[in-house]
């Protein structure tokens, strides 16, 4: 054994760096594409290079690292890569604020964060590292964009977009949260621009239907995607004008509730509907109303929660089922041009939005659905009745259920030629144009003669110019004096480059494929990539459910449709981890305080500088605004990587939030010292004898820890390790105790790799423990020889007995009847019946 032995305390400041260097030098975590081993692809969502990792990163990547190390020990060839989601607005903001080029700022941040991640000892294949801002990556993304363009899955059109007036760029609906830009927080406006779109709607049915096969995804995420895609069965039909405006004779409407047509009291169109535009030319007040509508974003949620406003056009429409009924036509701020037909009819009695609108503009409210016939004339107040029921006040539909009425109305509309049954989706095509510099240039050239012309692939990548400035808001590419001026590759005439860049969510929609295969001459090699794909286990935040995760599913399908891939789903398993939280603190004036500004003692919590008492607030997600962020670097300096990793896996189930506490990390540090002392037991000379209880605990631990890791129940794995350590510490010297201590370091190697490697080395074991095999358990040794059974009298628990497993029924009965508690309950009576359930209970019926 090494001369250093195990007499000293575990010192991570010496140990951590040594093993990190050895792992890197050996290349032991480099994945081999052509290995004969089973392939496992473990991936955490790659980070934006902000310049520092936070505790959320540490938790996320520790979980993935445990899986990667575990499956490597189980004999798998494991791909566990890391990269950087490196384009985006923060780099441009930094360029403006600090007078530094976005590339320089980004690459500096990447270098810093790479070293921070290496300090935690993650088993990452750094040979596959990528950054989306590198031409070697985004040039291949441009090639894929052109492939999709050729296949008709990319198009350009004028569209109402969500405009962020601070970032001066377009936002997808998913990037608008409560009416504000997801990064800037600015109130979003509606604006018309020529935009590039990806045809995600082409795959709407398949994206929706495919969710049912994702049985290793959280139900919450699948439900969120299902609602976002939003498939609706309904009817498209038209209303004729009573007196038609010039150029129009009818309005096409889509509804999911044709059964409520007899309850209609108005028709509303979007502010950018062709009829609204035509009417605005002749009505001086309408343009002002339309301009007010355009201050809203295009996201459905924001429109739904905004105050409902309408402009009465003075025109009327004829009801298709009751020609005597005339409905007023409004331009309304809650109707979207790109959903359905851009026109709806309102049934106030049974839709809250329509009711709010009707009450505001004094429109009729007519009940047409009631829970029973007796309630057919029950008045509607200020709350719409959305309950199911039967049709009332609806002519030939009366008495039918809503579902029957829908079918009846659609059948009549189709027979008479004024409507038809149809399916629509809430999902819109993905607008990917962004008016910013720091993104992937869209590889299109605009020519007055030829129109939009793809950049020839042999001219890719279209790289970003370095000589730009951010003195003015907006897109520097648009202002660049030379970059956008080119020759048309088709006709040779002067032309201009597309100055929009791609939404950064395009970058993250295929990076996991590039990790699997990185040839220089194409985006990826299909055969090589599919040795790894789909990703076996993907780990990241639930906030990406309808952003990145939906886009990645679309991108994979799009690539399959053009023959680039044979798979449709990118991620077999998805795990959404909880956040890392921390107490919040305020000074007497109510200002937020950071943990570094306070000190704690027995008397309470006080400001270090002034001694004033601090108010302790709720435990909340770590955030800069509330100053409750705990930086990983000083914690790593104090406790080492393994204690931090252990904390991240302990206590809370990984899908729940984890509260960071000093007491918790101190406890993890102490447990590292306990593990180190167990290593000394493993170094003992072998003793004779078998400890059956410890042997049973050991084999149960091997089984239970493995099952817990595979089930991503890391806190349960930690608990089982604690049980085993307790058992080893209590046991007397024996061959079993030495075996258990040796085995322990393979069991904890995925969680605390540095300590495990050091112990493995000092125990003179060959190679890395990271490359050792996961221990096997003997099923026979996981079965307890003795069990506890319940003893009941008349079905109520009266005693418990410890008996041999599989004890014969008659022996169990004798033991139960001999129980003093049972004898006391029977009071000398003979039992009427005794029921014995082997290995579980004895029930005495008195």
UniProtKB/Swiss-Prot annotation:
GO molecular function list: aminoacyl-tRNA deacylase activity; ATP binding; leucine-tRNA ligase activity
Q: Into which family does the record put it? A: Belongs to the class-I aminoacyl-tRNA synthetase family.
UniProt keyword ATP-binding present:
yes
Q: What is its main location?
A: cytoplasm
Record-linked Pfam families: Anticodon_1, tRNA-synt_1, tRNA-synt_1_2, tRNA-synt_1g
- Record: residues binding ATP: 624
Kindly give the Gene3D superfamilies that the UniProt entry links to this protein.
2.20.28.290, 3.10.20.590, HUPs, Isoleucyl-tRNA Synthetase, Domain 1
Motif 'KMSKS' region: chain residues:
621-625
Record-linked CDD domains:
Anticodon_Ia_Leu_BEm (cd07958), LeuRS_core (cd00812)
- UniProt-annotated location(s): Cytoplasm
Q: Which reaction does it catalyse?
A: tRNA(Leu) + L-leucine + ATP = L-leucyl-tRNA(Leu) + AMP + diphosphate
Give an example GO cellular component term for this record: cytosol
Q: Which InterPro entries does this UniProt record tie to the protein? A: aa-tRNA-synth_I_CS, aa-tRNA-synth_Ia, Leu-tRNA-ligase, Leu_tRNA-synth_edit, M/V/L/I-tRNA-synth_anticd-bd, Methionyl/Leucyl_tRNA_Synth, Rossmann-like_a/b/a_fold, tRNAsynth_Ia_anticodon-bd
What protein name applies here? Leucine--tRNA ligase
Keywords in alphabetical order: Aminoacyl-tRNA synthetase, ATP-binding, Cytoplasm, Ligase, Nucleotide-binding, Protein biosynthesis
Q: What is its EC number?
A: 6.1.1.4
Q: What organism does the record attribute this protein to?
A: Zymomonas mobilis subsp. mobilis (strain ATCC 31821 / ZM4 / CP4)
Q: Please indicate the residue ranges that the annotation assigns to the motif 'HIGH' region.
A: 47-57
Q: Which GO terms describe its biological process?
A: leucyl-tRNA aminoacylation
Q: Which SUPFAM superfamilies match?
A: Anticodon-binding domain of a subclass of class I aminoacyl-tRNA synthetases (SSF47323), Nucleotidylyl transferase (SSF52374), ValRS/IleRS/LeuRS editing domain (SSF50677)
